[in-house]
Amino acid sequence: NLSKADSIQDFEIKGISLGDSLLDYFTKEEILKNTYLYDNPKFSGTRIEPHDYYQNYTGMQFTYKTNDEKFILHGVSGLVNYKGIENNCVKIKEDIENQITVLFNNEQYSKRVFDTPYYELDKTGQSTVNMTEYVFDTGGSSRISCIYIKNEELKKDYYDLLRSSFQSEELVKFLSPGFIEEFEINGLSV
């Protein structure tokens, strides 16, 4: 569930916010066991799936500075794989978007919506992503995406996916001037 927020730093997914220490939720061993590095070593990430802490999600991804021993969060993503169930990703995505517009009604933001081939994972361009991105005037961004795997070969290892993510202003600036879409982790963009 989403919680009331005055700024992107106050926004929560399952009680986890930007600026929190990941150690408040997981052991150091859990974090390090699931750590991956970006192409640029300034930030690292952890993908933890599934976990009793967030039963409604198939997994969560967290981004923090590589050498930060407290694992302070600069990015939080909730993930839902749609294996074996009816894919109602668009409805859930729209519900999350509606909640964001209510929760951030006092904050100015720009919004863009697009459908595009999902080349980050599928070089054939068969798979697609439907994404809404909010960039907040006070810093930070949010993305809500439905990723549809249409390449038969990839369907063996990947599933359609809903991703709801939030990034700090520092992480957004780090990912710029290129598009955030260009950043890949195990085939999934941040």
Regions found by a protein language model. Give the residues of each.
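Amphipathic N-proximal alpha-helical interface segments
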Residues: D6-Q9, L32-V102, E107-V190
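Cleavable N-terminal signal peptides
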Residues: L2-S3
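N-terminal targeting signals for Sec/Tat export/insertion, comprising classic cleavable signal peptides
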Residues: K14-D39
